[in-house]
Amino acid sequence: MLAGEYAVLHGGEAWCLAVDRYAVVDDAPAAGGFTPPEAIAAWRLAVARGLLREAPAEGSARFDLTALSGGVGRKLGLGSSAAGCVAALGWAMERERPGSADARRDELARCAREGHREVQGGGSGVDVLTSALGGLVSVRFGDGLGGEAVVGRHRLPGALRWRVFWSGTSVRTSEMIAKVEALRAHSPQVHAARLAAIDAGTADFARALRADDAAAMVSAVRRLGGAMAALGEAA
């Protein structure tokens, strides 16, 4: 996530960039392996919506998420569960109808997001949409998180180069969201002010990107870092 964290949960815009680490899902060499519950939920929704004729049997797919854990089994914050859910649905669709995952990618993205959120019990699902669509994505939920996402696909300025660094500490998104929601409950004005600062930084980010101004984007990200730190300290 580049901009709009937490504010996206309350109608703000978020920007997210896919990375070149991949979840791999293929046929399991033997039945009975573990199937993530997010994949099971996505398959069930896909059947209801006509993306699949039938849901694969649990244990019929092999999941390899090692590229998203640095090979050390640690949670790096790269969206491994989101990528695994998307890859699982894409695998199931391709197994039934080759080419269908690409042909119906927008539907795949929405279905995977809803299946993932159903199991996770919250969050925006922006990471799922980004994993499915790739590249740089903007997302807003104008009608709440249960409604349709307004999604835009964009290009980074040619002069901009991104690198991803790990902090060295694993965190659970659900726990972070719970702390921010607790702030909203006991200090709603502080919560609103902190999210407004994130929204303002996100608007700066979007303007800079549309102007193809790499330096202004860096300034916006720096401002967003301060806004996120202030939210964390308040929560």
Question: Model-flagged regions — what are they?
Answer:
Residues M1-A3, V8, C16, V24-A57, ...:
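C-terminal nucleotide
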Residues V19, L76-A101:
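DPxDG-like acidic metal-binding loop motif
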